[in-house]
Amino acid sequence: MITICIMNKCSVCCGITAALLALASCNSDDLSDDSYYTFKGETVATYIENRPDSFAVFTQIVKEAGEQSLLATYGHYTAFIPTDMAFETYFREHNTSLEQLTLEEKKDMVYNHIIRSTAIDYLTKDFTEGALGTSNMNNRYMIISYIASDEGRNQIWVNKQSRIVVPDVELHNGVVHVIDHVLVPSDETLGSILDQMPAYSIFADALRQTHLNDSIAETYDMSYVSPYTTEFVNILGYTMKPLQQRRLGYTLFAEPNSVMQAAGINSVDELKQYAATYYGSEDAADPTSRRNALNRFISYHLLNRQMSTNAFIYSGPCTSSYYMDKRYEYYETMLENRLIEFKAGNRLNEQQNARFVGIDESASNIDGMNGFIHSLTDMLVYDETIMQQDVLNKRIRFDAYSIPPQLTNNNIRWKLTNLDGFGGYTMSPDYCGDYFRFNDASKFIMWASDYWTNYQADEISVRGWYDVTVRMLPVPPGTYEIRLGYSARSWGGIAQLFVDGDIIGIPVSFNYTGDQPQIGWISDDQTTDNGAENDKMMRNRGYMKGPNSVYAINGQKTLRQNVGSLRFIVGTFTFQDYAPHYFRVKNIESELGEFHFDYLEYVPTSLIDSEDKD
């Protein structure tokens, strides 16, 4: 259990004594006593303005940046406010002064310290190791770390640069955390940062030789032009916010030299030999070739989405309590068509013998301008035999939002359950590129709720004369059953399904709930065999109950216990090669019909008879 030095919100009647005790226990900078109080009706703006002995410099920067009204307005602001002593240190270390800061630098300084959320004030009780769920006003994430002091107390650090000395000052429009250093986010790429880390010199050299550092350097896709001219649009009577920019992001996993050396690798040349044992000898003389072994080795360490260590695995309330330690995710790496598996605890590619590659949390979450660097505890490779016969030889369930990296990089996935003032998001048909395409007639909605019967709270709802194509995760060659997870609704409509361009069976009715005779759902507790025979009967009709591992707060049931939570068996498919596969759904009945898209599953056919209910 982590013990954190925290002082809760105080009222004036608590007295000066309580404030002084908190000051001593948190070992804070030289703050005025009233910095520890929360006065009724104060905003973030008035809180800092009313304490010139502690926050005069930040207050002045806010005013000179023209942002006086920002922290005074209604909203949900989480402000990490540096003390005046923190600014003294910053000015001295950067050989500058308040007067020398440009207007742009002042705005950046304000935005670097403020998170503006639609509904959340981030209190320390909500912190976990890694990034906070909402980026700051400069689209950079606040990285939280817990570091023990010399006295053995766990202290909270932000961006590994600044310590929180006064936490959780709750105010009318947000919360203030007082910090002891000015936050200075890196403006360098991940490759440039790695070049400055001597402990990773072998990996950094390999990254340079492959030129893959150039592939992870961009921050925005400047080729994307949004067709939207307003902040909000109306879709089916709902207020939706269209995605206007396409931000890019990356995650880089790197073995430190110590891990390399433990594997007998002391130079890039030796790393090339090591990589060749897994990835072959094609184009051996050209490390920039995507077929080269070193290039493939490095590519498998890269994701085209930025994620901190607490962002790989879903952590919301829609997982059954018994299944928390069994949670998993699958992501396609930048080694084309090759997946990496994450399990709870950030165990990468865990084998049946319990061997896995871990992440060294203390050396990870290195924040660059467009992503994160994480340190590995063992060598990470895509071993064809192990991945096909062990790691990926299982049911692979993946949420709809996990497919396009654009939904992660632009703060959509797992971020929609606490919106205020609008219902969700929409996007243009080309926003997600090849990952997700739909026609202009599609009325496309992305929204979420912890109280709906969804796999990870998120859902996609499409109406109109829709025609939607999804690039499913690539899997190893083999024979798989593919399933669609959805919620059956009376307005579901009828659609034709396709896989890899081929029409699949007859049209599917998404408006049948499970208890209708076409499906035949019977609650497990109404059977004598815990639903075993009913499962067989439903499979014969092309359906399955929802998974027991997913929990719905509203109704206090798992999806298996919910009559409207179904899996439709799309069919059985044999894939000869590694390649992307495409799932298409086309409305053929009425523009009022809905396609509800929650998740997809691949299941090796050899495992179906022994499959669990999770």
What are these regions (language model features)?
Residues 1-24:
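Sec-dependent bacterial lipoprotein signal peptides
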Residues 20-50, 97, 176, 190, ...:
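Bacterial Sec-dependent N-terminal signal peptides
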Residues 35-44, 84-92, 184-189, 274-280:
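Acidic/histidine-rich, surface-exposed loop or edge segments in extracytoplasmic proteins
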Residues 46-81, 85:
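Post-signal-peptide N-terminal segment of Sec-exported extracytoplasmic proteins
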Residues 58, 80-90, 170-185, 253-263, ...:
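FKBP-type peptidyl-prolyl cis-trans isomerase
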Residues 92, 97-162, 270-359:
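Aromatic/histidine-rich interaction motifs
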Residues 210, 215-237:
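Extended compositionally biased segments used for macromolecular assembly or nucleic-acid engagement
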Residues 347, 379-614:
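Extracytoplasmic
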